[in-house]
């Protein structure tokens, strides 16, 4: 955004005056929601030296979208625990607004930016009560809707960070990815990919391998160019989890049934070490265990960087079992 085009505090207050309902608010506030967020715009929203605290000035007299724009800007700029604690009470008041659901559906970008700002500041400022805020947003958006919203991923991230795995599992099991609305609830496909990746991680943690694979397979199968980071991260785990569960991985045609040759080639390049590991893993020949160990040692930094070393080690521990099962299948073919 060019400097001369930056909005001012006066223009924000004027926009707030024009916001009489959800429709007029969403139209008037668009200039104050750049993607990605911009500090200069946040400063304009909050007023000189953040003294305006504009959210408190009109939270009762305007649609909730107006103060939520303020809260998103304020949370992004938090610098102290005291400031974080002071946000909670007025924010909760706005989140209890009777028309909040209809308002949130008018500005999905605002919802996404607010949710991600809360999740990103959560570890720095426990007084922000991030999980409570995100749960409240999630419940409002999930009213009579079972698909993924743009609050799902930040909520799961915070629940995992605070070791609330049972609650995270409930969110995942209560969500039907096939019912996702990519207009009102989830306009950014990246939010969907992030949810699929995190849901897969949660299912993996509780030992629900089939559900984890379903999440990650879905992420990998989306035809995006280029492949996104969460897709590559999901594929790496698909390969390892299939090795852990089955002892091998299917062909590329089976693994990527909806992707063209270019997309498959990109995935193979991005996840080359994992495909090599799978190839050696499935070769039950003399010396292959040592070769596998050497591969893991040589690629240890990559596995650690991908946070998959734990899963790799589990695969190595399960390999003798898969080798025995493979021999049993061979013996059954003898006359």
Can you name each region flagged by the protein language model?
Residues 111, 115-118, 134, 152, ...:
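TPR repeat positional signature
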């Amino acid at each position: 955004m060019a400097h001369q085009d930056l909005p001012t505090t006066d223009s924000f207050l004027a926009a707030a005056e024009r916001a009489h309902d959800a429709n007029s608010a969403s139209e008037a506030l668009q200039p104050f929601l750049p993607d990605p967020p911009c500090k200069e715009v946040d400063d304009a929203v909050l007023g000189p030296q953040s003294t305006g605290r504009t959210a408190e000035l009109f939270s009762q007299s305007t649609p909730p979208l107006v103060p939520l724009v303020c809260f998103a800007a304020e949370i992004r700029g938090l610098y102290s625990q005291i400031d974080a604690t002071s946000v909670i009470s007025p924010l909760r008041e706005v989140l209890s607004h009777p028309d909040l659901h209809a308002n949130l559906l008018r500005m999905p970008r605002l919802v996404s930016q607010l949710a991600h700002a809360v999740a990103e500041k959560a570890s720095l400022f426990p007084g922000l009560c991030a999980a409570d805020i995100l749960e409240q947003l999630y419940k409002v958006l999930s009213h009579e809707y079972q698909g993924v919203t743009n609050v799902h991923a930040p909520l799961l991230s915070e629940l995992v960070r605070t070791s609330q795995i049972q609650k995270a599992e409930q969110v995942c099991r209560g969500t039907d990815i096939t019912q996702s609305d990519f207009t009102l609830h989830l306009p950014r496909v990246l939010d969907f990919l992030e949810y699929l990746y995190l849901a897969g991680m949660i299912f993996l943690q509780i030992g629900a391998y089939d559900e984890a694979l379903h999440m990650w397979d879905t992420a990998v199968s989306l035809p995006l160019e280029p492949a996104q980071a969460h897709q590559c991260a999901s594929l790496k785990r698909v390969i390892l989890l299939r090795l852990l569960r089955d002892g091998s991985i299917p062909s590329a045609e089976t693994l990527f049934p909806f992707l063209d040759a270019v997309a498959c080639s990109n995935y193979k390049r991005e996840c080359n070490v994992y495909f090599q590991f799978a190839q050696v893993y499935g070769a039950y020949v003399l010396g292959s265990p040592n070769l596998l160990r050497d591969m893991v040692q040589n690629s240890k930094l990559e596995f650690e960087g991908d946070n998959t070393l734990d899963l790799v080690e589990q695969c190595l521990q399960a390999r003798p079992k898969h080798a025995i099962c493979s021999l049993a299948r061979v013996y059954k073919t003898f006359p």
